[in-house]
Amino acid sequence: MISLRHFTTFLLRSSRSVGLMLMLFLTCSLVSCDKLPRNGKLDGHWQLMELNGTSVRHEGTYWSFQLDLLQLKSLTHSPITEVQYSGGVVARFEHRGDSLILTKGYLMNRDYQQDILIDSTHQADLTAYGITEFPMRYRVLLLTDEELTLIADHHRLVFRKF
C-alpha cells in the first residue's frame, strides 16, 4: 500500500506538471495571437461579381484580405503598366466600421525580392479591379458572410465570398 507521504509527493509533482503545461499553453497562445484574423467578416477570398452595374463574374477577378494585406488576382486582366515586375498586385488597407481604405498598392517583383510602390513614378491602371487611385476610399455598403458591396465616388463593386 502507498504511504500518505508518497501520495502527497505524487500530487505535488503532478500539479506542478499540470501548472507548467497550462502556463506553457497560455504563453504559446498569447504569442501567436498577432496572426489571428482581425478584420471580421472581411477576411478571406472575394470574387468581384459586378463592377458599376455590369456583370464581371466571368473575368475571374479576386480580392483576398488577411491582416492588413490585400492580394489582387485576375484570370483575364493584368495591370496596365510600363513597369517591369514578375506578376501580382498587393495593397495595404485599413478597415474600420463602414470604411475601407486601400492606402498603398504594390506591383510584386519577386524576382528581385522587392515590390514596387504604385505611385506617380511607377503607375499602374487597376480599373479592371475596381481601383482608380491610391489611396482609394470605399464605403462598405454591405458586409455579410457571403456578400460585400463597396461604393467609391461613382463606382460600385459587388463581391461574393469565395
Predicted segments with their positions:
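Bacterial signal peptide processing site
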Residues: 34-36
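Short, exposed beta-strand-loop hairpins at the edges of beta-sheets
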Residues: 139-158
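Sec-dependent N-terminal signal peptides
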Residues: 20-26
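Short, low-complexity, disordered segments immediately C-terminal to signal peptides
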Residues: 38-48
